[in-house]
Amino acid sequence: MATTLTLSEAVTALQQGGVIAYPTEAVWGLGCDPRQETAVHTLLNIKQRASGKGLILVTAELNTLQDWLDLDTLSPERLHEVQTSWPGPHTWVLPASTRAPHWITGHHNGLAVRISAHPLVSALCRAWNMALISTSANVAGQPPARRREDLDPSLLPHLAGIVDGPTGGLAQPTSIRDARSGHILRL
């Protein structure tokens, strides 16, 4: 069984390139330092997920991602819609700058971002002072874990640890919308 981590221990694990599990708004997530390409590839290998699909970033403050985003290309109305939906269970694909790492964007020209209202996720991102990869804690194609005890045992040996707590109680993972068009990409 993977070790339970405090927030400061989780930050240390992230700094060292580790992958952690933590509860999100609806399901358990896997996370790592988005700046470390090796850590992201480790996470993708654990999930058996294709790298071209792109990944979601969760953060407490949008300014932690300012170098990776090109928000000037959004209309004021679209930007307002995005900003007023946060913090909350809304993931938006925002225009990525040329500095956004390809290992996060995948084969896309946008960056999927959520400013979470989940207390533990927000506290973790604040302690970390950076965004965190947020992808469901499951092998690709399998159902995501809704409780810690539902985490796939095959994932556990690969984790640096688990930040324990309840999920936010949502019935479904967060919606994903395209910030440029407003179209719903995932309900």
UniProtKB/Swiss-Prot annotation:
Keyword Oxidoreductase appears in the UniProt entry: no
Coiled-coil annotated spans: none
InterPro entries: DHBP_synth_RibB-like_a/b_dom, Sua5-like_dom, TC-AMP_synthase, TC-AMP_synthase_SUA5
Protein's GO biological process: regulation of translational fidelity; tRNA threonylcarbamoyladenosine modification
Cell location: Cytoplasm
Catalyses which reaction(s): L-threonine + hydrogencarbonate + ATP = L-threonylcarbamoyladenylate + diphosphate + H2O
Domain of life (superkingdom): Bacteria
A single GO molecular function term of this UniProt record: tRNA binding
The keyword S-adenosyl-L-methionine is assigned to this record: no
Assigned EC number: 2.7.7.87
Cross-referenced Gene3D superfamilies: DHBP synthase
Enzyme class: transferase
A GO cellular component entry from the record: cytoplasm
Keywords: ATP-binding, Cytoplasm, Nucleotide-binding, Nucleotidyltransferase, Transferase, tRNA processing
YrdC-like domain ranges (all copies): 4-187
Principal subcellular localisation of the protein: cytoplasm
Transmembrane segments: none
Its biological purpose: Required for the formation of a threonylcarbamoyl group on adenosine at position 37 (t(6)A37) in tRNAs that read codons beginning with adenine. Catalyzes the conversion of L-threonine, HCO(3)(-)/CO(2) and ATP to give threonylcarbamoyl-AMP (TC-AMP) as the acyladenylate intermediate, with the release of diphosphate.
Family: Belongs to the SUA5 family. TsaC subfamily.
Name this polypeptide is given: Threonylcarbamoyl-AMP synthase
Organism: Xylella fastidiosa (strain 9a5c)
